Every structure is written in C-alpha cells, then in structure tokens.
C-alpha cells in the first residue's frame, strides 16, 4: 500500500522520503520506477519499534528535504492475539510500531513543516469502528492511532491538518489463503475487495481539500456496517 501511495504522490520536482525495514530490494525497485517520472526519491532504513532509529530517520529526512509538507503513517504490525493469550512482547511491539512511532514522527514533522498545505495522514483500520475481541494488541494500537489523529488535529491546527483512512479488506495478509480472503470481502455489504487505488485517491482527496481535518474515512466496502453478527443471527431478530 505504501508503494501505491508513493506512486500516487509522485511527479516532476516532487521529493519523497520512503521508509523501509526489511524490504530493501522492493524499495530500491520502487525508487528506480519513480525516478522515471522525475520524482526525487530518498530511501531510509529504520525499525519503527526503536526510538533511536526513528530519530535517525527524521534526521536523515531533514538533511534531504528543504522542509516537510506531508507525512503518511502507513507502516504497521499486524499479528493475532486475544486478551487470554497476549504476551508483553506482542503488546509492546504493536504499541511501538502502530502508535508510538506515528506519534514521534508526527512530533518531528510538526517541528519541520514549512509548506503552505501541511498534512499528516494516518492509515488506521475499519476495526476501530467495529470492535471485536480478536487481534487484541493490534486493535488497541489502532484505536490509539484513531485517537492520535483526532487529538493531533486539534493540537496542530491551523498550520497542519491531520486525517486518517480506515481500510477494510484491501490486501491479503501473509496468513490468509485466497479462499479465506475472498470470503472476508464477500461478507461486506458491497461484496467487493477494496482497491488500493481507492486508498490512494483518498490520500489525494485529503491533501487537496483544505477544509478537512480530524476526520477518519472508512474505505472498506461497508465492512464496519455489518450488522449480521452471531448474536443477531442466533436471536429472534434473525429471519430467513
């Protein structure tokens, strides 16, 4: 998703810092591809669970860019656990990568934002609108990011706008089979997979609409609206 967003924002005389951790070859390939459009790309490696590496990434970005005008917090850790079996390691890893890192990056961005249209856009998850007991640590980190989006929009106005996007079934995760992923998106009201380009279009929409801040837009084929939950299906309200 990050690569698709970078492509959407690329163009002549545009400068973008792209972060990667373990996907160096993919990052280098993306850089080569975007260079063709006249975009200047700077790659930086960092583990977002480590505060010192986040600081190095910010320092690197300041050395390459004249100023900051857009931050996309897209990187995310996504592992399954529940209240009954979560570990301290899982808890801390999710909170560091999915909440602490965006907060620190937003703090650094705010200190160096010099553009005329400054934006922070956080990629969240439709789960924040429809809570379940699954993906416990992940969900807590994303609900925290939802709150960060709202509160930072208050703190950073009027110079910086902060918004969020809450995707639904967009990209099959590494543990899913094609069959399971299809079952997931076919269970949404619109019965369709969310296209990555729709996420990119939403990023572009937020950047261009200067009267919007503090909003979180669900792009999830209506997944957060699902009302046919097990309690309803097994109760008197359910009718064939």
Q: Residue locations for each model-derived region?
A:
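Catalytic loop of short-chain dehydrogenase/reductase
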Residues: 119-157, 169-170, 223
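Conserved NAD(P)H cofactor-binding loop of Rossmann-fold oxidoreductase domains
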Residues: 74-79, 222
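C-terminal substrate-recognition "lid" of short-chain dehydrogenase/reductases
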Residues: 196-219, 224-225
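Substrate-binding pocket helix/loop in short-chain dehydrogenase/reductase
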Residues: 82-83, 90-95, 184
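Conserved glycine-rich Rossmann-like NAD(P)H-binding loop of the short-chain dehydrogenase/reductase
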Residues: 14-28
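Canonical Rossmann dinucleotide-binding motif of NAD(H)/NADP(H)-dependent dehydrogenases/reductases
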Residues: 1-17
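Short, small/polar-rich loop/turn modules that mediate ligand/substrate recognition or access, typified
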Residues: 157-161, 213-215
């Amino acid at each position: 998703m990050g690569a698709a967003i970078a492509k959407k924002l690329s163009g002549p005389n545009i400068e973008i810092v792209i972060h990667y951790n373990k996907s160096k070859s993919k990052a280098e390939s993306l850089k080569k591809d975007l260079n063709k459009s006249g975009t200047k790309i700077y790659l930086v490696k960092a583990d977002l669970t480590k505060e010192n590496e986040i600081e190095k990434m910010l320092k690197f970005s300041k050395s390459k860019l004249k100023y900051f005008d857009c931050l996309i917090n897209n990187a995310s850790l996504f592992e399954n656990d529940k209240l009954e079996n979560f570990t301290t390691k899982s808890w801390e890893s999710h909170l560091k990568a999915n909440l602490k890192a965006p907060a620190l990056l937003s703090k650094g961005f705010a200190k160096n934002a010099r553009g005329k249209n400054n934006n922070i856009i956080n990629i969240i998850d439709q789960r924040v609108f429809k809570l379940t007991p699954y993906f416990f640590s992940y969900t807590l980190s994303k609900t925290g990011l939802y709150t960060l989006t709202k509160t930072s929009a208050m703190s950073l106005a009027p110079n910086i706008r902060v918004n969020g996007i809450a995707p639904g079934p967009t990209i099959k995760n590494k543990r899913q089979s094609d069959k399971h992923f299809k079952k997931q998106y076919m269970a949404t009201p619109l019965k369709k997979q969310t296209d990555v380009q729709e996420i990119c279009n939403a990023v572009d929409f937020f950047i261009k609409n200067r009267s919007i801040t503090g909003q979180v837009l669900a792009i999830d084929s209506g997944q957060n609206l699902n009302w046919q939950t097990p309690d309803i299906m097994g109760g008197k309200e359910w009718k064939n």
